[in-house]
Amino acid sequence: MAQHNLGYINLLRGNIAEALQEMYEARPLAGTTPIALAVCDTDRAEALRDAGITREAERLLASVAPVFGRHRMPQSRAEVEFQLARSQLTHDPVTAARTAATASRRFRALGAETWAIRADGIRLRARLSRRSPRSADQAEVERVASALADSGFANESTALRLSLDIWRSGRGMPHPAPVTRVPPTASIDVRLLGYEARAARAAAAGRDAVARRQSASGLDQLTAWQQAFGSLDLQTSVRMHAGGLMVAGLTAAARSGRADVLFEWSERGRHLSHQVVPVRPPEDPQLAADLAELRQRMSGDQTGRWRLDPHFAELEERARERQWSATRGGGIRRRATLREVQARLDDGTALLSFVYTGTELAVIVVTGARARVVPLPGWAAAAKLLPGLRADLDMAASIRTGPMADVVRRSLDDRLASLSSALLDKAVRVPGAERFVLTVPGILEGTPWAMLPALRGRTFTVAVSATRWSAFDRDVSVGGRVGIAVGPRVARGEEEADAVAAAWAGHSPEQLRGTDATVDAVTALAGRVDLLHVAAHGRHAVDNPLFSGFEMADGALFGYDLDRVPEVPEVVVLSSCEAGRSSVRWGEEAVGMTRVWMHAGTRAVVAAPVIVADDAACDLLGAMHAGLAAGLGVSEALARASTETGILAPFQVYGSGF
């Protein structure tokens, strides 16, 4: 257990990556009995929760609770419920309050009053959440906070008092005392709560500039703590800790009405999870072996029963944790200012930066000469159209003939027109603008921008952030070494590969087809070419986006496999269903195969966020490659191909398409 305990010490110190690594390595040695294994997994769940990976943490806690129950260990079972409530507090305060209340009752039945008070603290913090329909009794909050402090739990006492402070500010209530002092030994989440409490007080007093400064200071502290995380998985997950500060800063920025202020805060949010420069991990034979076994199990059982196999879950978990610990941070990328971004915009280019405060949506329209904020009051009605959009798109791709095709198409056209009107009609009215850079919040993730009437046939790119877009050279021609890979069972896949190869005939493209298109061969090819085209069936894993991928001859090529590519291509074209889909984490971060490629260094990815008909993909992308080979940029080639072929499809460019 010594190595496991070292991991727990790292957890208490806030060294999450080190804690996860130590606990992972110690698990086979420390978990010699079911009880010992359950104790180890409870601690690991706490580390996962602090890293923002709450779903896995809660799944782990749910699996260990029955172990303590079977062995008649009610105290340990109640402690698991306490940890479960702590995790739920970050995203589901109603459930957290119930879980904490159950734990508190169990502790009191055992005579464990101190533990019961700790559970009461979580229950009250859940009630003080802005998302809770019930509020907490302030007198009880003070009583429990004092009891926690008297019992030596200063961190938890401070967190409870700060939560009450934020709750009072949100309701415009007076404060009887200054903001609770945060101890220097406080955990990162409590330190951030301190900044949020001061920002909330300032906002309630109408001092928005102070609210923004406090929020920014807290986010800077989070950045300093985040530097060790090179893994995309961890970088996007720790955004959990930034939620309150981002809402406070963005809301205060929106109230200013100033484009420069709102732009700064929109970039803060987008830049947060990709500001750490990842150091590519060294070759890991064990990780490669685990991924290969996962592939084999998945491809060998088409029924999906492999998902129920505990060994599969163990392999998946082990692969994730090896990647977390192996990928380190290599410094912080500086966030671009509005003036720096404007200097990169020529007369024909405009940036449309969509900003969501949690209640309102606006777009900052930026050109080289000016920036203005355009409110989008029609957003509330348009938002109701999003839930059914994916179903309409999927049906339109699947039902292309017969009497139902017209019905489906009309429903989709109406939905797209309404979204376009609400989101873009005012924003694209930029004199002289012929191409657009879009940056979007998580609430708009999955929008098929290329199909919205305001952008049909127009040149645009969906960037991770304005900072990342501006870091790349403009209008770089695509070419050099070209690679093509075709997965199994793709209708017109061979024809599509022929069209791509014909477009690049002068470059002698390297091709992998049939049984030659294995995962190892494709990852090796990716490391040799400047442009990679993959025609394969895609798969998006909602629970674990880095296990998304596409099917090759011997199984799925996962997002994790890209760590095996020493130098990724400049441009990647993913002609596969769902390859452009993403999962949204903590309201902002979108993670999927497109993001994995860009995190690894790819400049532009062409993909679709929804199902695409095979014939549309073949014809449209074949025409796009002809444009690329003729010297057009990625976004322009795709837009021109859509106009020339008359094909309206959800393919769009992510990253820097021009």
Task: Kindly give the residue locations of the regions a language model identified.
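Residue-level detector of the short coil/turn that links helix A to helix B
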Residues: 14, 52, 91-92, 131, ...
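Basic/polar, acidic-poor N-terminal "presequence/leader" segments
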Residues: 125-136, 154-181
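Residue at a conserved register position within TPR or TPR-like alpha-solenoid repeats
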Residues: 10, 48, 88, 127, ...
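Alpha-solenoid helical repeat architecture
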Residues: 1-6, 30-44, 69-83, 108-123, ...
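Amphipathic alpha-helical protein-protein interaction segments
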Residues: 142, 146, 172-182, 188-196, ...
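Catalytic cores of enzymes
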Residues: 336-381, 385-403, 407-658
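Amphipathic alpha-helical segments of tetratricopeptide repeats
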Residues: 24-31, 62-73, 101-112, 142-150, ...
